[in-house]
């Protein structure tokens, strides 16, 4: 045998002896051992560096360890534990069984106070455990855990406290006070000795754990070791054998009860194994009849039936009563039935803010993410990792979503993202790419996708809510995904080609002055257009590459070919920071060709000094665009940054997204096709309302973790809701928020959130607000599919609108309804040929709600109002125009909002469309917030003085000014939304005038002149003024004000727009469209 192998044998033998010795000592019976009078060991300072912080951070819930580990942090640093024996309960018996004394011990540790009940025999068992531990710690066993314990123990001369030896039965009634004092002193001394205080037997005796003293988890609740039975989960579509007793498995777990949830942990690993939220179905039952278990305890909520087993019936009764009492005291709000059937309570004095369009919304999300210290929760229907949250881009990649998340993850923030897992054949949002991209950024970023379509049998419904939650204290709720195409501002631009101007080669960067800037040779749109007609793209690209190889030598290099290359070349390097403005696409192209790098690099120079790396972008001092300069052999080219880069420049009616794994490559030609502007609404709430949003996210996350086996590993942790008791402690507050009454609403069901009864509180809130509105309602929505026939459509929103108008007419009341929806549904299709089948199907149900068929709003109104319905309700869309490459172009503005404003005092903002998918609860999952003003400002309503809510009125005015074109012109008074002057002379008149001008100039579709497909073919073949006479067209377009246009109610009114038999859309169930 070699020396090396002999050493290996000796080492393994030593390890075996050490393990045997450790097991022997752990199982040592020390009942006869008494080490009275001996010195004890004492550690004056905590060993865990985290303990120096003075409190246990909330993030420690993700770092729990096995209960017997020596270095876990259970207690608050530098904070003593005070023990007091409050009372003694004496249980007597007529039999020969000795009387039992039960001591109630109150413990205080910092802000936390709790009670435990112990018999004297428990003290004796506890004392023996400590004696065994003391003997064990003296033996130098060569194991890592034992060595750590010994190294962290310092000897100090102190006597080991001893328990009274006299029997409980020998104590007289008058001696109880003395016994209480003895036990109290014993505990006080033990708890002053870190060696014993941190021992797992002590923490179990005191009913404490690593999660006991975390401030944001609320008051110290009930804790203790129990036996837990497997099963009881409600997982839709899965029929497991959990109902047969043979399938049950019992496991030892540490149960923790908090103010709004309970959980249990695995003692050996410290892992949180399940979280059960308190809700209105929360019940605790005791007994064999209820639990089918001797000494059983049953806990129910909307998601699970949990069966526990105790040591005795009395123990089970105590657990049941204590849990109910604690939850009633600290979590009563979660047990109640709330308004609209919502899972969330109405919260007073809650800070809230609205957003019109994504510019401010994205900026505030970016700023809030920067302030995150513990957690970021995100859930979206679609998420694009490479989008920029702040634009124009002037700080490189700093505000790109994936870069923000990576930066925060590196700082220790835990990031949890849930994405809708689409049916890939039906949708091209490529959530797998999003997940893969985000997960590889950092281990602190966890992404789940749901649902699994086969196992859950969910093919038709989607997770549609859009939420961003920061530290469970600030929550963004609305209709805006963090995805391509969503960013927009109040200008709703149609074009984004940037601009390039050339300065003569004699000018140097240093000598560039205001005068020289004015003398730049500019490329007009017309010149560029003429050039594009003459030069094919392939020739330009080839010529540019050829000239670049000899840059600085040849003077034949064309400014046009460089311009073309700067603006039209597709990016190949998706990770390049430089891929985000008009000139940097050219740089990226050159970097991908190694033979050009060395020749070109000396000639590329930024006009402004950059704070980023070579790949970074320049900063600038204005908000209009980033001025760039490229030094070439033909002088200086100065450009303005783009707002939409690569896939972000989109027009999904013209063409749906493709190749999402190439984020900075254009997929439509921005020189010939205008983008589709995006109009949307968002909100942010703080405090208790934000806690409610986080609670919904946590419920969905934990449900998905249980349901999908791939997420059951410890790398995907269970999430815990923070306590409402600490919700007022805001570490960050979004600027501009105002106080109001706020309640969260949702659409949720078994498939989406794992709950027993579906919730449709958004639908109930819409109905309530419409029925109780007194003056007006203003609706912006992506869809308008309602008016129930109880066969195909079931939501009642449209019916309630019609009934409210009829009520106003009968009472002689002035009442207005404003409906703003997209002129066309957001599906790919050529409307000049009638549109695609999906587009037509949505058009059918929109028209069925508004004006076609006996169930429609107008058909419900006409029998009583005739044509006077026009005085009560207005249907509108949004449209804009621009010049693109020398041509006049127009495009609808896609209304994606989910907004309801009533009476300038109530607002609903969320992700829910007005259709059955969003409203019924059993279908798509949705989230919304209802805000009711408590702060008022003087206003006018129906010609009379009126106290309008600050939140609702300001939002309504912002929407009106935007769509009517009065954002920068306060000449018209928009205060009174009900008066005839506003409704007829401003709103209806502006919409009609704009629609007429657009029809005259562009012959827009949809159009009221077109009733069938034959008329449609004739309509599109007629000459268009914008092409025939551009000057006259421009003169007409100058009369346009704002974006508002009348909705064409009679477009294709003679056609059946439902999918034709034989098409794939006709095979799909009708519920998909409604």
Curated annotation (Swiss-Prot):
Q: Where is this region: Catalytic?
A: 463-928
Task: Please give the Gene Ontology molecular function terms for this protein.
Answer: phosphatidylinositol binding; phospholipase D activity
Location of the protein in the cell = Cytoplasm, Perinuclear region; Endoplasmic reticulum membrane; Golgi apparatus membrane; Late endosome membrane
Per the annotation, which location comes first and is thus the protein's main one? Answer: cytoplasm
Q: How does it assemble?
A: Interacts with PIP5K1B.
**Which residue windows are transmembrane per the record?**
none
* Name the UniProt record assigns to this protein: Phospholipase D1
Q: Which parts of the sequence belong to the PH domain?
A: 219-328
UniProt organism field: Mus musculus
Lipidation residue positions, type S-palmitoyl cysteine: 240-241
Pfam families reported for this sequence:
PH, PLDc, PLDc_2, PX
Q: Which residues form the PLD phosphodiesterase domain?
A: 459-486, 891-918
Regulation of catalytic or functional activity? Stimulated by phosphatidylinositol 4,5-bisphosphate and phosphatidylinositol 3,4,5-trisphosphate, activated by the phosphokinase C-alpha, by the ADP-ribosylation factor-1 (ARF-1), and to a lesser extent by GTP-binding proteins: RHO A, RAC-1 and CDC42. Inhibited by oleate.
Q: What is the lineage of its organism?
A: Eukaryota, Metazoa, Chordata, Craniata, Vertebrata
User: Can you state which reaction this protein catalyses?
Assistant: a 1,2-diacyl-sn-glycero-3-phosphocholine + H2O = a 1,2-diacyl-sn-glycero-3-phosphate + choline + H(+); ethanol + a 1,2-diacyl-sn-glycero-3-phosphocholine = 1,2-diacyl-sn-glycero-3-phosphoethanol + choline; 1,2-dihexadecanoyl-sn-glycero-3-phosphocholine + H2O = 1,2-dihexadecanoyl-sn-glycero-3-phosphate + choline + H(+)
